[in-house]
């Protein structure tokens, strides 16, 4: 008898492969002669990197990046080798560098948490030769509109005095100018496919701050301030980059990370 085990991860407990291995061991207790094959599975959230990288014959890369609180964390991403159908591809979960599970309950504050580490993951993958990206956005501790990620990739967000704005949602309202002169030149060679399961716009009553801000530690006052700051950021982005559209479905995903992409 042949048995194929493919199970999603059990959040905060077992990875897809760990859960599959446990089931395999149970099956073999009852059917010792069974040929049991374990394959990773994921739904785009936790465990997606491992599932795609291992399931498609890729490799896992570990790198130290800036975590959501500004402290170093070790994050993982996957690399798929180039073949006839795709260039060398990186698989990234933003939650590996900016996830809410990286922030203790008492420290959750989207005014200060940053996506800078996500940009560092992308930069590391570019340095490793990747030019196509599959990025899962979700499970974030952030509401910074993705500016942290963009800062790590060389975009400059400057205040009225020409100084870089602070990391986190607190820096959004201070943005007076966006400059792209220092962006990584390799970024022009890259393509991104964003994995997202929500359609929220960036701002407003169904926007990222109102819907997801409270679970990230935002008070009602913070939600109002963050929403106004994201609107300011979106309007300035539209002046700088004509294609920026804060109403596009999914731009409010992961604290506005969808808008950044």
Regions found by a protein language model. Name each.
Residues 1-137, 141-261:
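N-terminal loops that bind phosphate or other acidic moieties
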């Amino acid at each position: 008898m042949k048995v194929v085990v493919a199970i999603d991860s059990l959040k905060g407990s077992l990875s897809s492969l760990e859960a599959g291995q446990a089931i395999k061991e149970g099956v073999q207790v009852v059917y010792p002669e069974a040929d049991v094959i374990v394959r990773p599975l994921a739904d785009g959230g936790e465990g997606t990197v491992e599932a795609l990288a291992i399931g498609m014959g890729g490799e896992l890369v570990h790198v130290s990046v800036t975590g959501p609180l500004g402290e170093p964390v070790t994050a993982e991403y996957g690399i798929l080798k180039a073949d006839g159908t795709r260039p060398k591809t990186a698989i990234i979960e933003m939650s590996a560098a900016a996830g809410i599970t990286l922030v203790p309950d008492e420290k959750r504050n989207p005014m200060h948490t940053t996506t800078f580490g996500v940009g560092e993951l992308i930069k590391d993958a570019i340095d490793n030769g990747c030019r196509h990206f599959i990025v899962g956005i979700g499970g974030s501790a952030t509401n910074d509109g993705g500016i942290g990620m963009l800062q790590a990739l060389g975009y400059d967000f400057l205040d009225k005095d020409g100084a870089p704005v602070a990391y986190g949602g607190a820096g959004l309202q201070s943005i007076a100018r966006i400059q792209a002169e220092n962006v990584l030149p390799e970024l022009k060679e890259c393509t991104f496919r964003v994995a997202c399961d929500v359609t929220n716009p960036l701002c407003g009553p169904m926007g990222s701050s109102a819907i997801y801000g409270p679970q990230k530690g935002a008070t009602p006052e913070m939600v109002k301030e963050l929403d106004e700051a994201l609107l300011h950021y979106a309007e300035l982005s539209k002046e700088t980059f004509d294609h920026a559209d804060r109403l596009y479905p999914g731009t409010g995903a992961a604290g506005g990370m969808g808008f950044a992409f």
